[in-house]
Amino acid sequence: MAHAEEPEDRTASTEPVVRPGSLLVSSTDLVEPAFRRTVIYVIEHNEAGSLGVVINRPSETAVHDVLPQWAPLTARPSALYVGGPVKRDAALCLATLRTGAQADGVRGLRRVHGRVVMVDLDSDPEVVAPLVEGVRIFAGYSGWTYGQLDSELQRDDWIVISALASDVLAPARVDVWAQVLRRQPLPLALLATHPIDVERN
């Protein structure tokens, strides 16, 4: 069965539910350089902990230089993205399925949520290519032990928003942090106007 784009969750809850397919949008008070104005796509969230990748931090390393076989499938910019501070020497890959494409039973693809799938980088790109709109490859990931993310949510470090499949492949020229906030209802949407450099404002 094909998975269409899920309807967007346009509600902000004081007790947000994190699940695979959620976005963790850093709050304006989170000034730690590694996560300031970041958007994290949640891949796993269970009793063992949580795992996700930052989807708006392209690096200067070209995919062609490290995984040339995947470069033709990589959405622009064809750069390796910095997925987070954990295991920066390891690569994770997400892809967005084409509308109507079937991933069930395809070796190397694992559904995360809706049209977003994880791709095993040891699989055959020629098998994957007809099924996906593009892939995004990340160096490292962001991880939390059990209860750690809940503590950060209680501190209001993160805003939980449901992702659209298109968020995963957003081009570098798009301010993803502002874009996902702007599409939320007021007053949350107003945060999108928060200046990048507060000291300049």
Curated annotation (Swiss-Prot):
Record-stated family: Belongs to the UPF0301 (AlgH) family.
PANTHER family registered for this protein in UniProt: UNCHARACTERIZED PROTEIN YQGE (PTHR30327), UPF0301 PROTEIN YQGE (PTHR30327:SF1)
SUPFAM superfamilies, per the entry: VC0467-like
Organism this protein belongs to: Rhodococcus opacus (strain B4)
Pfam families found in the cross-reference section: DUF179 (PF02622)
Cited InterPro entries: AlgH-like
Stored HAMAP family: UPF0301 (MF_00758)
Protein name per UniProt: UPF0301 protein ROP_34500
Cellular component annotations (GO), alphabetically ordered: cytosol
